[in-house]
Amino acid sequence: MKLEKLPEEFVQAQPVLEKISEHGFEAYFVGGSVRDVLLGREIHDVDIATSAYPEEIKDIFPYTIDVGIEHGTVLVLAGKSEAEHYEITTFRTESKYTDYRRPDHVDFVRDLREDLKRRDFTVNAFACDFEGQIIDLFDGLTDLKERRLTAVGSALERFNEDALRIMRAMRFASTLDFKIEEKTFSAMRERSHLLEKISVERIFIELDKLLLGSEWRNGLTLLIESEAWKYLPDFQDLALKKVLTELSVDFHFKNSEQAWAALLTRFSNIDVKVFLRKWKVSNEFSKYVADLVSAYELENWDLVSLYHFGLEKALLVDELKIAFGRDIDRERAVFINDQLQIHDKSEIVIAGKDLMDEFSLKPGPELGKILKTIEEKIVKNELKNEQIAILTEVKKMLELEK
């Protein structure tokens, strides 16, 4: 088949493919970008594959960067903007995958079929020339029409080569609403133990995308049915089942933090920060999720808790509570937030230096205690956030200590 109209991203890259062709080599758009064009989805990355070897690409284009030349990839700087920088990879075959993630060795080839047959799924094994002609060597168009994910060739071999493909399949089931072809799913289940060989950082990325997909329930169901959950750090299948059965069917997560918090509210005997440490997430992400889980346990918002967690987290938590069927006052968080004089201690009109100057105080525990007390009183609306009111209050506190 031929595309009626090339997407703008392909049109912009057309001269690159044409130039390679003018030098006697083949060049195609490949991978997920072609799939997304056929699905009418937004393109994120334009990948180009060619029969030209890396050194030949460098001879054709004056401005290039070696970004992965040992694997056949050269970055071509076709223009000044980053959008005009293209990774061009030579057709290749791959040897065994000792680490179940990356090939031990690659060989450059001139044959497009040899390159495409090493790809993960048929819907990712399309090629498209600069005129929009689609090359489909593995019946991917049929799978695309049926919204079916089928491994290219032997599914067992594909997952042996790269076990992360198991998580990618689940992610596609979530983000693209694809079902998994029977033999492909059977191979996923049989090879799920190989996920232990994959870094948790890479698994996290795929699982995170799964959770944010429009059909995340499909993805989580596959995670359970494939038994892949057993090989993820500290995962509990009962918790996953609870999320599927207890969360309202039409709920979609606002962000990653909310999604992971939803899972963790259903885990038993879990220390959120210890759990997330095993997933090697950032401290910022870990704290955010831990805050959401802690806030979820609160019965109601008050001035102190709203100040501590902030309105953004409060609203995310309230969405989860409602989605899990808890009866809450939907307007309370905003109402309480409006009653707060400050939302951060930096908004207090007087700083420690002001108190040191006014009362001849020195830095130390006493000053810290005074500042903390002032902050608490302002939050509870027991003290106005005004200079005279605060100085008067501090004076009283110091007199009581004499």
UniProtKB/Swiss-Prot annotation:
Q: Which EC class is the enzyme in?
A: transferase
Give the keywords, sorted: ATP-binding, Magnesium, Metal-binding, Nucleotide-binding, Nucleotidyltransferase, RNA repair, RNA-binding, Transferase, tRNA processing
Q: Which Gene Ontology BP terms does the record give? A: RNA repair; tRNA 3'-terminal CCA addition
Catalytic activities = a tRNA precursor + 2 CTP + ATP = a tRNA with a 3' CCA end + 3 diphosphate; a tRNA with a 3' CCA end + 2 CTP + ATP = a tRNA with a 3' CCACCA end + 3 diphosphate
Q: Which residues bind Mg(2+)?
A: 45, 47
Q: Which SUPFAM superfamilies match?
A: Nucleotidyltransferase, Poly A polymerase C-terminal region-like
Protein residues bound to ATP: 32, 35, 119, 162, 165, 168, 171
Picking any one GO molecular function of the record gives: ATP binding
State its role. Answer: Catalyzes the addition and repair of the essential 3'-terminal CCA sequence in tRNAs without using a nucleic acid template. Adds these three nucleotides in the order of C, C, and A to the tRNA nucleotide-73, using CTP and ATP as substrates and producing inorganic pyrophosphate. tRNA 3'-terminal CCA addition is required both for tRNA processing and repair. Also involved in tRNA surveillance by mediating tandem CCA addition to generate a CCACCA at the 3' terminus of unstable tRNAs. While stable tRNAs receive only 3'-terminal CCA, unstable tRNAs are marked with CCACCA and rapidly degraded.
Q: What else is known?
A: A single active site specifically recognizes both ATP and CTP and is responsible for their addition.
Protein family: Belongs to the tRNA nucleotidyltransferase/poly(A) polymerase family. Bacterial CCA-adding enzyme type 3 subfamily.
Assembly and interactions?
Answer: Homodimer.
Q: What is this protein called?
A: CCA-adding enzyme
Say which species the protein is native to.
Lactococcus lactis subsp. cremoris (strain SK11)
Gene label: cca
